Design a protein with these regions (language model features):
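Right-handed parallel beta-helix/beta-solenoid
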Residues: 1-31, 48-50, 76, 80
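Short, T/G/N/S-enriched strand-turn elements that build extracellular solenoid repeat scaffolds
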Residues: 31-37, 52-63, 83-85, 274, ...
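Extracellular beta-strand repeat scaffolds in secreted/surface proteins
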Residues: 42-46, 74
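Extracellular beta-strand/beta-solenoid scaffold signature
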Residues: 56-60, 91-115, 139-159, 181-204, ...
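Soluble non-cytosolic domains of exported or imported proteins
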Residues: 24-27, 119, 162
C-alpha cells in the first residue's frame, strides 16, 4: 500500500521545480497539487502569508472513508491565512443531468470555483482565505443574466454513490461575485450538489452522509451563503409527508452546519437541502438577501426567484435549527429570518431574530407540515412577525415577540394554520 505524503506549498519561497516534500522544498503553485492524485492520509500544507493569485484547487475522485482523512490546511507560526484569489479561473462544467424542481432554474453551465471537491470524501479543509472576484465595470454587467456562476468551495457527488465525511472549518470566504439569479448552480460561498450518475445501478444514488461546516466566515457572496445538498433526485421528495427511507436511499444524512457567520449574502444565508435530521446551530446571518431587489435583480428571464430568507431547510425531514441569530434580512417576497419550507417536522428552538424586514418566521406552502417554533425570541421584526403561507399546520409555543406599533403579528394576506400556545406578544413603545 502506498504511504501517505505531506506536501508543502508556498507562494513566498516555493518553486514548482521542487519536490514539495518539505518546507525548504515547497511547491510554489496550487497547480502542482491539482496534478497529484491524493490518497488517504495525504496532507497539503499552505504557508501562512501566501497569496495564490489567479489559482484554484480542484480535487477529483479521491479520499476513502475506510482510510485516513485527507487534510488541507495552513502551516507556519506567523502571518495571515493562506489566500486563494481565483478571479474567475478554475472553470468547470456543471450539469445535473436533468431539469430541476422548477423548469426555470438553470441546471448546467460553466462555474468558476476556488476549491472544487468532485467525488471526494473523507477530507478536511481548514484555515484558508478564499476570494473569487469579478471586476465588473457597472451594475449592468454585474446584473447580467448570463454571468458565470462562481463558488468559494464547491462539492459535487456523482459517480461514487454516497460520499462520506466532508469537513470545512475556519474558512474565510468573501467577495465571490457569482450569478445574481442562479439558485441551484454551485453559486455562492459554499455550495454542495448531487448530479445524475453515469451508471446509478452500479454506483448507487449520488448523495452525502456526513458533512460538517463550522467556524466559517462567509461575506459578500452571490448568490447563496452556505447550501448543502441540492439533488438531481428532487422528484423523490415531492410528497408532503416524507419517509425516512427515501432520505437514506436518495437524500443526505448527518449534515451539521454550526458556528458560522454569513454576512451580505446576495440571497439566502444557510440552507440544508433534502436532508434527514440536519442540525443547524449557533450560526449568525447578518444583512442577507442584499440582491433580492429591483435595483440588482433586474434580468431573471424565466428564473423568477426574487425571494430569499436567512436560515432555513428545504425539503428536509426533522430538521433542527437552534441557537441561531438573524438580523437585518432585506425585504423581498420573503425576507424573514426563518422559514420551514416544504419540509416535514422542522423544529426551530432557542433562536433570536431582530429587525428582519420580512418578519421572523414563515411556514411555507402546502407541503410544510408538522413544524414547530418554540422558545424563540423576536425583537422588532418587520412586515409581519409570522407568515403562515398556506401551510396546513404549525405549532407555535412559548415564544416572546416584541412587536413595533403598526406591524401585524400575522403578515397580511397570509391564511395558513397555526396553533398558538403560551406566547408573549409585547408592544414596543415609542
Amino acid at each position: 500500500m502506498k504511504k501517505s505524503t505531506i506536501y508543502f506549498v508556498s507562494s513566498l519561497n516555493g518553486n514548482d521545480e521542487n519536490d514539495g516534500l518539505s518546507e525548504s522544498t515547497a511547491f510554489k503553485s496550487l497547480n502542482k497539487i491539482n496534478e497529484i492524485e491524493l490518497i488517504p492520509g495525504d496532507k497539503v500544507f499552505l504557508l501562512r502569508g501566501s497569496v495564490f493569485e489567479n489559482e484554484f484547487l480542484h480535487l477529483k475522485n479521491c479520499g476513502d472513508i475506510n482510510g485516513d482523512m485527507i487534510e488541507i490546511t495552513a502551516y507556519g507560526q506567523d502571518g495571515d491565512l493562506p489566500k486563494i484569489n481565483t478571479n474567475g479561473q478554475g472553470v468547470w462544467y456543471q450539469d445535473y443531468g436533468c431539469e430541476l424542481d422548477y423548469s426555470g432554474h438553470i441546471y448546467k453551465g460553466n462555474v468558476s470555483s476556488s476549491i472544487l471537491l468532485y467525488d471526494v470524501e473523507n477530507i478536511l479543509i481548514r484555515n484558508i482565505e478564499i476570494t473569487n472576484k469579478e471586476e465588473f465595470k457597472d451594475m449592468e454587467s454585474y446584473c447580467a443574466p448570463d454571468k458565470m456562476d462562481r463558488t468559494g468551495v464547491a462539492a459535487v457527488a456523482k459517480n461514487r454513490g454516497t460520499l462520506h465525511s466532508i469537513k470545512l472549518d475556519n474558512l474565510f470566504i468573501h467577495d465571490v461575485n457569482g450569478n445574481v439569479y442562479n439558485k441551484h448552480m454551485n453559486n455562492g460561498g459554499i455550495y454542495m450538489t448531487s448530479f445524475t450518475p453515469d451508471n446509478e445501478k452500479e454506483t448507487g444514488a449520488a448523495r452525502y452522509d456526513g458533512v460538517e461546516i463550522k467556524n466559517c466566515y462567509v461575506k459578500n457572496v452571490s448568490r447563496w451563503g452556505i447550501a448543502v445538498g441540492y439533488s438531481y433526485r428532487h422528484k423523490d421528495f415531492a410528497a408532503k409527508e416524507l419517509d425516512e427511507e427515501t432520505f437514506k436511499k436518495y437524500g443526505n444524512e448527518n449534515i451539521i452546519i454550526k458556528n458560522n457567520y454569513v454576512k451580505y449574502a446576495g440571497g439566502d444565508a444557510i440552507t440544508p437541502m433534502y436532508a434527514l435530521t440536519p442540525l443547524v446551530e449557533h450560526n449568525i446571518a447578518d444583512s442577507c438577501a442584499t440582491e433580492m431587489n429591483d435595483r440588482i435583480y433586474k434580468y431573471p428571464q424565466k428564473r423568477a426567484g426574487k425571494v430569499a430568507a436567512a436560515i432555513w431547510p428545504w425539503k428536509c425531514k426533522n430538521a433542527l435549527l437552534r441557537y441561531n441569530d438573524v438580523c437585518d434580512t432585506k425585504l423581498n417576497q420573503d425576507g424573514m429570518a426563518y422559514d420551514a419550507d416544504s419540509g416535514d417536522g422542522t423544529k426551530y428552538e432557542y433562536n433570536y431574530s431582530r429587525l428582519n424586514e420580512g418578519g421572523c418566521m414563515m411556514f411555507c406552502l402546502q407541503q410544510a407540515v408538522h413544524n414547530t417554533f418554540e422558545n424563540n425570541l423576536s425583537v422588532d421584526d418587520l412586515s409581519g412577525t409570522m407568515t403562515p403561507a398556506s401551510n396546513p399546520d404549525a405549532y407555535v409555543a412559548n415564544n416572546t415577540f416584541y412587536v413595533r406599533a403598526g406591524v401585524p403579528f400575522v403578515r397580511k394576506r397570509m391564511h395558513g394554520k397555526m396553533t398558538l400556545k403560551n406566547n408573549k406578544v409585547i408592544k414596543i413603545e415609542k
